[in-house]
Amino acid sequence: FEALSRGAERAWFWDRSAACITTIRDNARHLNAGDRVIAQRIDATKPPTAPRPVDLVFLDPPYEQGFIPTTLDALTRHGWVRDLTLVVAETKRREQLVLNTDWISLDRRDIGDTGLSFLRPSMAGAA
C-alpha cells in the first residue's frame, strides 16, 4: 500500500491464506485503492504469467524454509522480473540468504529480528 500511496500504478498481493487476501481487499477498499490492487490467493513459487515486468517486488515468505530462491526463479521464469526490478526480501535476522548467480545483493539491513535483503537480477540472469 505504501507503493500505491507513492504513485505506483498497481500492486499485486499474493498469499496462500484466504483470510489474508480478504484483509488485503478490505484494506484496499478502505484506502480507496481497490481499483489498483490485485489480491490473489496464489503460492508465489507458482505465479501466473506476468502481464508485464514489475519495478518492485517485496517478498515476505515464512522464514527459514528456502522459499526466496525458489520464488525468485519462478518470478523470473514467468516474466515478473526485468533487469531493473528491485526485490526486497524479508528474512529472519540470522537467516543466510543463498542466491544463485542470477541475482546480486545490493544491500542488507537488519531491523530488530528481521533482515531485509535488497536484490537485483544480474545482467546474466535478467529477463
Region annotations inferred by a language model:
Residues 1-127:
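Class I S-adenosyl-L-methionine-dependent methyltransferase catalytic core
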